[in-house]
A protein has these predicted regions:
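Structured soluble/peripheral alpha/beta segments that form catalytic or ligand/cofactor-binding pockets
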Residues: 1-381
Length: 381
């Protein structure tokens, strides 16, 4: 199949842009964006993903207001025939590339669901390409993907359950990743080692537990990102980050240290601090405290989401499928589900206020504490 993109001179192999070179069913390509008000009383999480080898395109719009509920809208439909322009779309939701690597617009039209949104994202620092994410378990390559990410600001509006919020320079963050990751497409082969599960990254440590922390941060003057992955004993296997004096060049992070104060009885942080050693000899200090509630990511369809429990990238319907639910987030860590059951998700990503070298700003702080974690004195889970 030919598309307009095939007129360009940017092919990466002997295939058209309608297909991918990998035959792995898990191959994905995702745009994801978050934004939240300075006080954390309102926030959104939005994304669209294409699974070319599963003939599926999915989208999600998740919102929280006043720190007590998470509203979830999920879409899934066949990918083909698909649009070959620069716009990602699924049903009533789309993400437009206004200025590549700088400005995007995400919209969800009003419908028979509790969220409507029109937000324009603009980067405050350049998009940063991470080191490749790769991993094997029992000889099988389970991860092989790329990601770039960017700290920015969001302007526009959001309506949630009839309440309207105007966004003026809300903190925003986005990532775009593509490749192969575990827990996509409905099944993952078992090869001998049981993993802690919960997030795709848990496969990278087998049965040794996972600690992952990421900061995307800005106070308008200084901004940047840092990601660390370690196993449960503290052995580090991934470090990637760079910082900016806004308007200046990137400065690489060469080492980092973290200190976590946990909320009692949970694996959520009350305070997360980082020291970043930079290539220019400086050390930057970050101190984040939660506002709002950490996203329960299965509401987006990831991590065994959707009503069928199969998670992302599964062919579900020959027409547009729409799912809607609302979670009670009033407890610190436990999610009260609409059917009266409870869940304790492993994949949480937190909105925060963050001091950056003593100057207050905001940060987006995913933190996964999965499996055995003896160094933190946490009971096994």
């Amino acid at each position: 199949m030919l598309t307009a993109l095939d007129e360009t001179l940017h092919h990466q192999g002997p295939e058209t842009f309608a297909h991918v070179l990998s035959t792995d069913h898990r191959f994905y390509d995702r745009q994801l964006m978050i934004g939240f008000s300075p006080d954390g009383k309102a926030g959104f999480l939005a994304g669209i993903t294409v699974f070319k080898n599963m003939n599926v395109v999915e989208g999600f719009m998740v919102a929280q207001v006043h720190g007590n509920k998470q509203y979830n809208v999920r879409f899934s439909q066949p990918l083909r025939p698909f649009s070959d322009n620069m716009q990602a779309e699924v049903g009533p939701m789309n993400i437009d590339i206004v200025r590549p690597l700088q400005e995007l617009r995400v919209r969800l039209a009003k419908g028979d669901y509790p969220i409507a949104l029109d937000m324009t994202y603009e980067g405050v620092i350049p998009a940063g390409l991470q080191e490749p994410h790769t991993g094997r378990l029992d000889g099988r390559k389970h991860s092989d993907y790329m990601r770039y990410h960017q700290v920015g600001k969001a302007n526009g509006w959001m309506e949630v359950d009839g309440e309207r919020f105007e966004a003026v320079d809300w903190f925003a963050w986005r990532d775009h990743s593509w490749g192969v990751r575990p827990v996509v497409g409905g099944f993952e082969p078992f090869t001998g080692t049981q993993t802690a599960g919960g997030v795709a990254s848990a496969a990278q440590t087998g049965d040794r537990g996972l600690f992952l922390i990421y900061f995307g941060f800005s106070n308008g003057v200084q901004a940047g990102d840092i990601q660390i992955k370690e196993d449960g004993s503290g052995k580090r296997f991934f470090l990637d980050g760079e910082v900016y004096n806004v308007g200046g060049p990137a400065i690489r992070v060469v080492d980092a240290r973290h200190h976590i104060e946990f909320q009692p009885g949970t694996r959520l942080f009350a305070t997360a601090t980082m020291e970043l050693d930079l290539a220019n000899g400086e050390t930057w200090h970050l101190k984040a405290k939660p506002v709002g509630k950490p996203w329960a990511f299965f509401g987006s369809g990831m991590d065994g989401g959707f009503f069928d429990g199969q998670g992302q990238g599964v062919y579900r319907s020959s027409e547009l499928l729409t799912e809607v639910d609302v979670y009670d987030m009033s407890e610190p860590e436990i999610i009260n589900m609409p059917d009266g059951s409870t869940r304790l998700p492993k994949h949480r990503e937190q909105l925060t206020v963050c001091e950056i070298n003593g100057v207050e700003g905001q940060a987006y702080v995913p933190m996964f504490v999965i499996g055995k974690q003896p160094r933190f004195g946490l009971p096994d889970r």
